[in-house]
Regions:
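Substrate-engagement module of ASCE P-loop NTPases
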Residues: 196-207, 213
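Conserved nucleotide-binding/hydrolysis micro-motifs of P-loop NTPases
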Residues: 100-103, 166, 216-220, 263-266
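Pre-P-loop entry segment of helicase/translocase ATPase cores
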Residues: 1-56
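Post-Walker A helix-loop "phosphate-sensing" segment adjacent to the P-loop in P-loop NTPases
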Residues: 78-90
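Conserved nucleotide-state-sensing and coupling region of NTP-binding domains
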Residues: 89-165, 239
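Walker A/P-loop
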Residues: 52-75
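RNase H-like, metal-dependent nuclease domains and their acidic two-metal-ion catalytic environment used
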Residues: 72, 108, 112, 116, ...
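Conserved H-loop
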Residues: 61-64, 98, 215-218
Length: 416
C-alpha cells in the first residue's frame, strides 16, 4: 500500500531529479516529480507504522536519498491538509536543526525544498491556498484568512522552523510533529529528545510524532548521542526494526531505519524502482578497493562513510587518523554483541613477592571499557595473554614493547 505521505511526495512535491541516458555517463538535473524507489517506500511504511503504533521514528541514511525532500513533504502535507482526516485543523509541524544553514531557504536547507512544494500545491491544486502568514525570514507559515469582521478562518495549520542547537527550551511546549534535521549535529541530543517527548506524549499515548534523520559522513556530526537512539530505539519509544543491516554477530538485534548505499544506487535499479543489490554492492566495494591504494590513507574511510553498507560505516568520523577505523568499529560492535568474549581476559593487579619477583593476582576491580569516564574512575589491569617464558621460567628479552600515555587515563600498553 501507499501511505498518505508517499502519495503526497509522488504527486504534489516537485524536486530536483537526476536523469540518466543508457550508455552515457552524462546526467542532467532538472525539476520533476520524484521516482518511486523501494527505499523511499520502506521509509514511508516505517514512518506510518511508527505513528500508528504510538512511537517516534529515526533514520540514518546515505546521501542523496531524498531525506530533506521527504521532511519537506511532511511539512507541506501537514500545513495544507493536516495530518489526517481526524486532525486537519490547528496541526503544528516544527522543523528543527542545530545549525541554521540546515533550515534556511537560501542555504539549500530543508526550507529550500519546502517552499517550492508549497508554491506548486497552491498554484496547481484545489486544496486550500490562503496563507495567514508566509514569512521565510521568520521561518513561519500558517494557513487561514481574515474574515471581514476580523475573525480568523481556515485550518490555521502551522509550519515553524526552529534553530534549537542544544537549547531544549526552544522546543519545550511545541505540541506537534517535530522533525530533526541532521540529528548528529546536536551535541545534547538525548537531553533535547527527552524534554521534547513531554510535549508530544501524554502518559502512554503519543499524539504527535518526532522524526529524527541523519546523514552518513556529515562532517559536523559526531553521532555520540544519536547512536544510543539508533541502537536502543525501544528504550526511547522509537519504532524499531530487526537489525538486518549489520554483519552477523555484530551490532544489536534491533535498529532504527537505515537507508544503505546499495539501495536505489544510481544505475542499479529497474524501471519499478527495485534495487539490483548485487550490482550496487560490487560498485561500492570496487570504489573502496581503488581508494585503498590512493595517496591519502584516509581516502578509503571517506569512501566508506559516503557509501555505507552498514550503520557503523555511516557514522565513522573521518579525521586525520591512520588507524583501521572500519575494522576497529567492527570489532567494537562484535564485543558489544558478545560480552562473553571478555571472559578470557585476566583482571587483577601486580605485586612484588618476597624474592623481588613481579607476580599477578586476580581482583574484582572493574576495567574501563566505555568512554568517556569520570575522573575518579579507578579502572583495572587487564592481561589478554600472559607473558611467554623460556625454559628457565624467565620472560623472553626484547619480545614486548611498553607504550605509555601519560595523559588522559594514564594508560600503559604492553604489546607483543
Amino acid at each position: 500500500y501507499v501511505t498518505g505521505f508517499l502519495y503526497w511526495f509522488l504527486n504534489y512535491c516537485p524536486m530536483m531529479v537526476n536523469f540518466y541516458k543508457e550508455g552515457q555517463k552524462k546526467a542532467i538535473r532538472k525539476e520533476s516529480f520524484g521516482f518511486f524507489f523501494e527505499g523511499i517506500w520502506w521509509r514511508s511504511i516505517y514512518l506510518y507504522n511508527a505513528r500508528e503504533q504510538g512511537h517516534h521514528a529515526i533514520e540514518l541514511a546515505k546521501r542523496g536519498c531524498a531525506k530533506s525532500y521527504f521532511l519537506a513533504t511532511i511539512m507541506s502535507h501537514n500545513l495544507i491538509v493536516g495530518e489526517s482526516e481526524a486532525t486537519h485543523k490547528r496541526c503544528i509541524t516544527i522543523l528543527t536543526a542545530a545549525q541554521k544553514e540546515y533550515l534556511k531557504d537560501d542555504k539549500d536547507g530543508t526550507l529550500n525544498k519546502f517552499i517550492p512544494e508549497l508554491s506548486f500545491v497552491i498554484d496547481n491544486t484545489p486544496f486550500p491556498n490562503l496563507l495567514l502568514k508566509n514569512s521565510p525570514n521568520e521561518m513561519s507559515w500558517q494557513m487561514g484568512y481574515k474574515k471581514p469582521n476580523g475573525a480568523i478562518g481556515g485550518s490555521m495549520n502551522q509550519v515553524l522552523g526552529v534553530s534549537a542547537k542544544d537549547d531544549s527550551d526552544k522546543l519545550r511546549g511545541k505540541r506537534g510533529w517535530i522533525l530533526y534535521e541532521e540529528m548528529g549535529t546536536f551535541d545534547g541530543l538525548l537531553e533535547l529528545y527527552d524534554v521534547t517527548r513531554k510535549s508530544v506524549e501524554d502518559g502512554d499515548y503519543t499524539f504527535s510524532c518526532m522524526y529524527l534523520v541523519g546523514t552518513a559522513n556529515n562532517k559536523e556530526s559526531s553521532f555520540l548521542s544519536a547512536k544510543k537512539l539508533l541502537y536502543a530505539p525501544e528504550s526511547y519509544n522509537i519504532q524499531s526494526v530487526p537489525n538486518v543491516y549489520d554483519k552477523k554477530g555484530s551490532g544489536k538485534d534491533v535498529f532504527g531505519f537505515f537507508f544503505p548505499a546499495y539501495i536505489n544506487r544510481a544505475g542499479c535499479y529497474n524501471k519499478d524502482g527495485i534495487s539490483d543489490v548485487i550490482k550496487a554492492l560490487l560498485q561500492v566495494l570496487m570504489a573502496r578497493y581503488k581508494a585503498k591504494y590512493g595517496a591519502d590513507p584516509t581516502s578509503v574511510l571517506r569512501v566508506i562513510a559516503e557509501d555505507p553498507i552498514t550503520p557503523a560505516e555511516a557514522i565513522i568520523k573521518v579525521k586525520d587518523a591512520y588507524f583501521p577505523v572500519a575494522s576497529l568499529q567492527e570489532r567494537a560492535d562484535t564485543l558489544d554483541k558478545n560480552p562473553s568474549l571478555y571472559d578470557d581476559i585476566y583482571v587483577g593487579e601486580l605485586y612484588t613477592t618476597g624474592t623481588g619477583e613481579i607476580e599477578f593476582r586476580p581482583t574484582d576491580d572493574i576495567p574501563i571499557r566505555t568512554y568517556p569516564v569520570d575522573n575518579d574512575t579507578k579502572g583495572a589491569l587487564e592481561i589478554y595473554s600472559m607473558p611467554k617464558k623460556d625454559r628457565e621460567g624467565k620472560v623472553f628479552n626484547d619480545r614486548y614493547i611498553i607504550g605509555v600515555d601519560p595523559k588522559s587515563l594514564g594508560l600503559i600498553l604492553v604489546i607483543k
